[in-house]
Amino acid sequence: MIAAQLLAYYFTELKDDQVKKIDKYLYAMRLSDETLLDIMNRFKKEMKNGLSRDFNPTATVKMLPTFVRSIPDGSEKGDFIALDLGGSSFRILRVQVNHEQNRPVHMESEVYDTPENIMHGSGSQLFDHVLECLGDFMEKKKIKDKKLPVGFTFSFPCRQSKIDQAILITWTKRFKARGAEGNYVVKLLDKAIKKRGDYDANIVAVVNDTVGTMIDCGYDDQHCEVGLIIGTGTNACYMEELRQIDFGWGDDGRMCINTEWGDLGDDGSLEDIRKEFDREFRRGSLNPGKQRFEKMVSGRYMEDVVRLVLVKMAKEGLLFEGRITPELLTRGKFNTSDVSAIEKDKEGLHNAKEILTRLGVERSDDDCVSVQHVCTIVSFRSANLVAATLGAILNRLRDNKSTPRLRTTVRVDGSLYKTHPQYSRRFHKTLRRLVPDSDVRFLLSESGTGKGAAMVTAVAYRLAEQHRQIEETLAHFRLSKQTLMEVKKRLRTEMEMGLRKETNSNATVNMLPSFLRSIPDGTEDGDFLALDLGGTNFRVLLVKIRSGKKSTVEMHNKIYRIPIEIMQGTGEELFDHIVSCISDFLDYMGIKGPRMPLGFTFSFPCQQTSLDAGILITWTKGFKATDCVGHDVVTLLRDAVKRREEFDLDVVAVVNDTVGTMMTCAYEEPTCEVGLIVGTGSNACYMEEMKNVEMVEGNQRQMCINMEWGAFGDNGCSDDIRTDFDKVVDEYSLNSGNQRFENMISGIYLGEIVRNILIDFTKKGFLFRGQISEPLKTRGIFETKFLSQIESDRLALLQVRAILQQLGLNSTCDDSILVKTVCGVVSKRAAQLCGAGMAAVVEKIRENRGLDRLNVTVGVDGTLYKLHPQFSRIMHQTVKELSPKCNVSFLLSEDGSGKGAALITAVGVRLRGESAIS
C-alpha cells in the first residue's frame, strides 16, 4: 500500500516537473488578464475604425455590412433552399418553415465533397461544381421544376451592397479558385445556373457562415445578437446600430456586421503576442501575412502550431530524445481532433501515446505529459484571445444600449468549440473575468449555418410582404402636392362661404368675427387680469402693461387643473370652478378688492356680437359641460362671480386663443396679422378686410376673423383624404362627426390615429409579436410629448424602446422602427394639412390687397408646433410650396394667448376711453 502511494507520488511529482518545464519554455504564449484587456481595447479601436468611412480603407478589421437588418420573429413561412459553402464539405438543405405547425422548421440535407483540385482550380469550376451538387439534390427531392428561393452561406470575406449582392474580397480556408476574387458571387452562381439550363433558382440572400449561425439562433431566442464561429476558421458578427455605421444608410434600426476579425493584426499590431511558431507557420501557409489572428486561434492552424512546437522542442532535445519522424514534419498528419483527444481529462495521456505512436514517435511517459501540456497552452491561448475579442463586441453592445449591465445571447458554432473537451469552459471563464458586467447566454448551433441562410431568406420574404402591406396602409396618409393644392382650394371655398351672409349657415368654416379691429399702438397702460381656458389646464394671469419710451409687460400667473368630471358636468359647476380659481389667484397676489378689467381667452367656437359677448357654438377638446352651448360665456362668468359674492370683475373682452396668440406676437412684431394654434386643438385667425365680412356692419379698416377651421370637412368635403383610421378615431371622439380637420391635425388626436394603426399592424402580426396588450387598447396613451420624443432625430432606437416600455409596450428593435415610421407618416400629414390651410389664409390676404407679393408674419402657439421635432419644418415647407408669392415668417408665442387677452383688454379699455372723450 505504501509502495503504491510512493509510486503515485513519484509520478505526480514527475508530471508536475514536466508541466513546469513546458510552462517555462512556452511562457510567452501564456497571456495575462492585463494583456487580454489590452487586446480587447485594440480590437475595440479596430472595430470603430472599420465602421468609419474615413478609416475603413486602412482598417485591418473590415467590419463588413451584411444588409441583414432583422432576425426571425417566428412568423416566417415558406419553402427554401440553403447552400452552405465554407470548407472541404459542402452542404445543401431544403428548409420548410411554417410557424403554425408543431415542427415549425423541417429540414432535409445532403453533404457533398469539394475536392482539392476544385478548391484550387478556377472560379467557374468551383461554381459549376456547386450547381452540379444542387441539381443532384433537387433531383433527389423532386423539386427541380420549382423555382425556390435560395439562401447562400458563403463563408469568405465579401463586400456587400445589398443582401443579394456580395463581392468576394479574398479567399480563406485554403480556397484559391482563380478569377473569383473581386466578382459578384451571385452573378457567378447565376452564370453557372444558365450554363446548366436544367433548373432555375432565385438567389435571395448571401450571408457569411457567422451571420447564418446568429440568424439560426434568432428564431429560438430573440436576445441573440452575436454569432461566433470557432472551428476550422474563426469569425464573429453582431447587430450594430445603424447610427454607428458611417456609410450613410440611415440612423434607424440595426444591421448585422461581419467583423472578419481573423484579419486582426495583419498590420503588425499583434506582433508583441505572436511568437516564433506563429511566424514560422505563416511562411508556409497559403496566404502568408494574412489572417494573423485566425492563425493563432482557429482549429485549422492550431494543429500546426502544436506540431511546430513539438518539432522545435524535439530538435532542442526536450522531447522524444531529440528524434523527429517524417510524419511529425508533415503538415496534416497531426490534426485538431488529436489536440482535443489529448486534452481529455481521463484518457488524454492514453490518447497521446496512441497518436504519437501513429506519428512514428518513440515516446516516454514524460513526453506524453509534455505533449498534453503543449496542447493545453496552445488551445488555452486560443480561448483567451477569442474571449478578449468577443469581450470587445459585448462592451460595444453595452455602450450602444447605454445600459450598466448587458444581457445577450451568443450563438456558437465550430468544431473546436463543440468537440474540444476544455475549450468552451476556459473560454467562458476568461470572458466572465474580462467583462463582468455582461450576462451572456451561449447557445450551440445544432443545425449549422445552412439553416441560418434559409432563415435570412425567409425573413427577407416576410419583410418584403410586410413592407408591401405596410406601405399600402400608409400610402393613404401620404399626400401629393396636387392633393394639398386641392385641400387649399376647398378650404378657400369654405372661407368665402363663411364670410358671406347668405352662405354662412352652410359653411363648415364659420369665419367668426372677433370684433377686434385694432392691435396695440404702444399707449396702453395699466393692470389687467386674464383667463386662459382651452384645455385640461387653465391659467389666471395678472398682466402689468407700462407705456412710455420703453414699453414693458410684466406677467404673473398660476395654473389650475380642471377635473374631467367638471369638464363634462354642468355649466354652472364649470364656471363656479373657474371663479373659485380666480378667487384663489386674487388672494395669492393680494389684489382682491378693486374691480379690475379682465380679458377672457375662451378657446372654443363662439358667435360674437361684440368684443365682450360670445355665444358658445359647440364644445371641442373633450369639454361637454351642459347648459353652455347657445349661451353667452361672458354672462355665464359674470353670473358665477355674482354667486360667489367675493369680488367683481370688468369683463372687457372675450377672445379665442388663436386671436390672443396673434395679439401677443403683434405686440412684438407689427407685421403679425395671422394667428395659428397647433396643440391640443388647431385653429387659425387673420385680419380680414371689413368689406368682406358681411356678418358685421361697416366697410372700413379690418377685423380679426376667428376661422374655427377645425370644422373644415364636417360637410364631407374632405372625405376623400380621410382614412379608415380617421373615421375610427372620429367615431370614438366626444363630438363624433365634428372637427374633422382638427382631428387630422391636432395633438389630442394624432396619438389616437397612431394607436389605431399600431393595433391594425399588430393584428396582422407586424408588431409586438401579434399580441395586442392592454396598454395598446387604452385610448389616449400616445400623448403629443411621446410622439415628439419618438420622432426626435437625436433619439436612438434603444430610447424609443424605452419610451414604448414606459407606455407598457414591450418592443423589439424592428417594432421600434415601425412605430417611429407610423408616427412620422401621421405627423407629416398633419403638418402638410396645416400648411395647406395656412397657404389658403396668406393667399387670401395677398389677393385682398391686390399685391404681387405679400410679406406677413404668423404668430404661432401650441405644444405640437413647439415640441415636435419635424412638424414646424414640414409645415413651413408646405406653405412655401403652396403659396410661392407670399413670404411668410413664423413667430413663436412665448407668453401664450393669456397675454394676448390682456393686451386686447388694454386696447379695449383704451378705445373705450377714447370713445368716452369723443
Swiss-Prot record:
It catalyses: a D-hexose + ATP = a D-hexose 6-phosphate + ADP + H(+); D-fructose + ATP = D-fructose 6-phosphate + ADP + H(+); D-glucose + ATP = D-glucose 6-phosphate + ADP + H(+); D-mannose + ATP = D-mannose 6-phosphate + ADP + H(+). GO terms for cellular component: cytosol; mitochondrial outer membrane; mitochondrion. Pathway: Carbohydrate metabolism; hexose metabolism; Carbohydrate degradation; glycolysis; D-glyceraldehyde 3-phosphate and glycerone phosphate from D-glucose: step 1/4. Keywords: Acetylation, Allosteric enzyme, ATP-binding, Cytoplasm, Glycolysis, Immunity, Inflammatory response, Innate immunity, Kinase, Membrane, Mitochondrion, Mitochondrion outer membrane, Nucleotide-binding, Phosphoprotein, Repeat, Transferase. Residues 521-655 are annotated as: Hexokinase small subdomain 2. Residues 656-895 are annotated as: Hexokinase large subdomain 2. The keyword Phosphoprotein applies. D-glucose 1 binds at residues 155, 172-173, 208-209, 235, 260, 291-294. Catalyzes the phosphorylation of various hexoses, such as D-glucose, D-glucosamine, D-fructose, D-mannose and 2-deoxy-D-glucose, to hexose 6-phosphate (D-glucose 6-phosphate, D-glucosamine 6-phosphate, D-fructose 6-phosphate, D-mannose 6-phosphate and 2-deoxy-D-glucose 6-phosphate, respectively). Does not phosphorylate N-acetyl-D-glucosamine. Mediates the initial step of glycolysis by catalyzing phosphorylation of D-glucose to D-glucose 6-phosphate. Involved in innate immunity and inflammation by acting as a pattern recognition receptor for bacterial peptidoglycan. This is Hexokinase-1. It comes from Bos taurus. The gene is HK1.
